[in-house]
Amino acid sequence: MTTAHIDAEYQANAIESQIQNDWENRKAFKVADTVEGKHRYILSMFPYPSGKLHMGHVRNYTIGDVISRFYRLKGETVLQPMGWDAFGLPAENAAIAHQVAPAKWTFENIAYMRDQLKKLGLSIDWDREFATCTPEYYHWEQWLFVQLYKKGLIYRKLSTVNWDPVDQTVLANEQVENGRGWRSGALVEKRDIPMYYFRITDYAQELLDDLDTLKDGWPQQVLTMQRNWIGRSTGMDITFPSANPEIYADGLTVYTTRADTLMGVTYVAVAAEHPMALKAAENNPELAAFIEECRMGSVAEADLATAEKKGMATGLFVKHPVTGEEVPVWIANYVLMSYGSGAVMAVPAHDERDFEFANKFNLPIKQVIDAKAADDAEYSVTAWQEWYGSKEGTLVNSGEFDGLEFQAAFDAFLAKLEPQGLANSKVQFRLRDWGVSRQRYWGCPIPMINCDSCGQVPVPEEQLPVVLPTDVVPDGSGNPLNKMPEFYETTCPSCGGHARRETDTLDTFVESSWYYARYASPDFTGGMVKPEAAQSWLPVNQYIGGVEHAILHLLYARFFHKLMRDEGVVQGNEPFTNLLTQGMVLADTFYRESESGKKTWFNPADIILERDEKGRIVSAKYSGDGQDVVIGGQEKMSKSKNNGIDPQAIIDQYGADTARVFMMFAAPPDQSLEWSDAGVEGANRFLKRVWRLATGFLEKGYAQAPIAAELSKDAQDLRRKTHETIQKVGDDIERRHAFNTAIAALMELLNATSKFEVQTADDAAVAREAIETLLTLLAPFAPHLSQTLLAEFGIDLIAAQFPSVDESALTRNTQTIVVQVNGKLRGKLEVSVEISKDELLAQAKALPEIQQFLTGPTKKEIVVPNKLVNLVV
């Protein structure tokens, strides 16, 4: 008989809701703002409340939960919080589509998604939950903004943006499709508008240097991406004096990391907005029209790299700083005014963009670097890559500088030009200051006031927060705050005169740059974080999220930590000690293509599949009409490909524990996971077997007893397997994050325990230890099942400890020896680990299955200690 209150069959849904209620009633995962003893902060990137969880969320939060539950078993106090990244454009777009206030849409989504997360069985302290769209949260973001503005770390300047004249709004680059607004279809204009910027460049060197302190805890790939994004380079500012001082007196100063190519300059390119270009266009309508065309183009650096090269000669010239020769000045659409000085020296022989441009406009190409240091190298269309790609070449065609290599040439040009005031050495960063103004309604109000007399004045601290009105239903025609005098009309804090409140809101990356710190004391009303809570919990010990956040979010959060440190809010230099970037979740795609080439995508749930004996899909039909669909292969789950699997459907059918085990078993966490219905069923079968093993053992009613000193060989083997599994699972979770191999080890322990026959009370004690260990080690992955079954063994999972390894159980008294004849396996022996070589050979030869092969004389006897005997006859 099973115990009175437990089913013989695994009923996931019944036990999961019961266990979740137990956790809620006991506040099982609540922690204090300050904590003594060993403690740890585990954080998964918080979700945007889009309305429904997707499988990427399930993977992210299950990884965080496995790590959290593991450390709780290890006796540590673990903070694992959850909240909502709640501002942003999708809420505004949904509000426009459904004619509902973004606040209402957002909070309804939060309620639904919170319920979904709870059903996943996450060990979260829900008392710390917050949404970033509440004044209690963004009050302190505004407070920090004011402090930074006063210190000069935030400034305002004109910036070129994409303007939709119909919607009266600014568009992000990705919202411009073929030059038109994605919603209105109107031709997009370029406008210069004032925007606020964070001086992240002031921290560029520190952001770069501190990456070295993360090398043991962050993936190398992420560190490299951040290094490249910050992009420190040592180069030279070189001035080309004006050859037309009567028109444009100032020379052109360019920054280059390749001063060694100076003698290969055949033209200088400037941005369309460069003062020299504007001066040249004053009496040149054609040039003025070209400048306007460039201004209308994309402002994204990535687009410029791939866009068609466009240019026009200004008719002005500068003098080469070494030779004094006149060099033409061209306007080129690949030069950005916002980068460096807005001018570049063009060396077509050794730079791809310059080469394409020179070819298009028939400008000279002069080779000045050659790997072979030969003057007679033929220039070819493809050779520039070879010449430019390496700094190991030698200067040619460079007059007095011929024969010099990169560093020597750099030093020689500097020595020649610096005394004339035409050059100086300079460190530059690719990183640009962070523009945070958004001409949107659903965001954190920027706490600034515009006064005609006083200019920009920060809102006094006692008047914070500036609260965003939440009963607004936007209609898509610009920022509704601009039509609300009750919001923007105010008085100037400096002069008391009539003034206008800033109606731009902050980039939502600002909220996600400091939320991790707020979790330490979410209800604190005296500042961003309670000092003693920050002292207790920060930095985050383990951060988990997608690699797509490697640059922006993680860089901004690192920047904010340093800003908060310098305001005395937090200590330490970095927010996240360890980072785990989980891979994508992939699923099969299915579609039909119309004659026009338009694809209609079908959800995998609506597809009837036929598979071959190896499980591969051979045909697919849409269940709606029974007709074939095209099998598109596996791609990242997405709305656009309609290949998302609803986590709720999996939880309803199999239970959260099955979903969790599948997600952790299907692939290492940092690699892509291929969704597989068969894999989900396999995870469910595994849990059913665990359930049957445990309930079957309980049914027998064995009395509890200590492990005996003397055990049968089978019992010794099972104990060894049990303690090897403790060792492996502990290492796999803590050090390697190899959750898939940890589960594989639990499957092996399940197999070994299932095969073990209990014949004595001592055997029962060993089996009980194996089952209790299996359930405890499984708890981070399948907490509902584990807690339910452990309770039947008299163990409360919430108070349970990770099992400790009994070293004596790992030692082997016997070993299995393979016996070969002429290199072929013919038998096996179980012998003492201390057996002598002679005794081993004697026992091997005495095996009946071996003797039949020993008819002739034995030529050779090979013994590999602890492994095999090979008899050559």
Swiss-Prot record:
InterPro entries noted in UniProt: aa-tRNA-synth_I_CS (IPR001412), aa-tRNA-synth_Ia (IPR002300), Leu-tRNA-ligase (IPR002302), Leu_tRNA-synth_edit (IPR025709), M/V/L/I-tRNA-synth_anticd-bd (IPR013155), Methionyl/Leucyl_tRNA_Synth (IPR015413), Rossmann-like_a/b/a_fold (IPR014729), tRNAsynth_Ia_anticodon-bd (IPR009080)
PROSITE patterns from the UniProt entry: AA_TRNA_LIGASE_I
Principal subcellular localisation of the protein: cytoplasm
EC number(s) on file: 6.1.1.4
Motif 'KMSKS' region in this chain: 636-640
Motif 'HIGH' region positions after renumbering to this chain: 47-57
Catalytically driven reaction(s): tRNA(Leu) + L-leucine + ATP = L-leucyl-tRNA(Leu) + AMP + diphosphate
UniProt-listed GO biological process terms: leucyl-tRNA aminoacylation
GO cellular component annotations of the record: cytosol
Gene Ontology MF terms in the entry: aminoacyl-tRNA deacylase activity; ATP binding; leucine-tRNA ligase activity
Keywords associated with the record: Aminoacyl-tRNA synthetase, ATP-binding, Cytoplasm, Ligase, Nucleotide-binding, Protein biosynthesis
Pfam families, per the entry: Anticodon_1, tRNA-synt_1, tRNA-synt_1_2, tRNA-synt_1g
List of residues binding ATP: 639
Record bears the keyword Membrane: no
Protein's cellular compartments: Cytoplasm
Family as reported in the entry's similarity comment: Belongs to the class-I aminoacyl-tRNA synthetase family.
PANTHER family found in the cross-reference section: LEUCINE--TRNA LIGASE, MITOCHONDRIAL, LEUCYL-TRNA SYNTHETASE
Protein name: Leucine--tRNA ligase
Protein's organism: Acinetobacter baylyi (strain ATCC 33305 / BD413 / ADP1)
Organism classification: Bacteria, Pseudomonadati, Pseudomonadota, Gammaproteobacteria, Moraxellales
Gene name in the database record: leuS
